[in-house]
């Protein structure tokens, strides 16, 4: 009898894009979790996860290979190496919280280069100036007709997290923005 083998394939496998001013690449597979918790649980969860959960708007924190993005009061997106079990790690805190694995729901597109800001702003109304959106800033916002989580990793690198079902649309919009950035 033959054996079935499950192979994980990126929703953007084979996609290529960018321009002379912008590089568009699919981020490596990652573990992700949506975390909700009351303020009194933040310290215990931070300790269990190995990263200090940010408590201010647009803030992020990185520790132990994990990045925590503040999405709203009492809500974070956790991103870490593939295989990280955020649900089990958070359970070790022994405090009231909700942690849901969303690793297969999202995909990330890395937008980098001198025209990265222009490419992202082509379909995102967020003010991406250094004063309003410095390195380390993150936000749940819109891009075209979809919701994304935007994270500024460095001066000219943005991580665009979107749902897999919107990956093709998101990548196409970023390709158009990258072309505009090269003009």
Regions found by a protein language model. Give the residues of each.
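Basic, glycine/lysine-rich polyanion-binding surfaces/domains
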Residues: 1-183
């Amino acid at each position: 009898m033959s054996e079935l083998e499950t192979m994980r394939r990126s929703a953007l496998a084979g996609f290529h894009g960018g321009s002379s001013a912008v590089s568009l690449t699919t981020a490596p597979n990652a573990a992700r979790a949506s975390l909700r918790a009351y303020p009194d649980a933040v310290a215990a969860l931070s300790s269990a996860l190995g990263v200090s959960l940010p408590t201010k708007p647009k803030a992020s924190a990185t520790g132990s290979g994990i990045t925590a993005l503040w999405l709203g009061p009492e809500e974070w997106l956790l991103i870490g190496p593939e295989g990280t079990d955020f649900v089990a790690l958070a359970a070790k805190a022994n405090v009231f919280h909700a942690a849901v694995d969303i690793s297969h729901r999202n995909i990330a597109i890395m937008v980098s280069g001198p025209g990265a800001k222009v490419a992202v702003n082509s379909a995102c109304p967020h003010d991406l100036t250094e004063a309003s959106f410095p390195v380390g800033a993150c936000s749940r916002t819109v891009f075209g007709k979809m919701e994304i989580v935007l994270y500024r990793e460095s001066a000219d690198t943005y991580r665009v997290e979107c749902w897999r079902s919107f990956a093709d649309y998101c990548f196409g919009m970023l390709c158009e923005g990258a072309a505009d950035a090269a003009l």
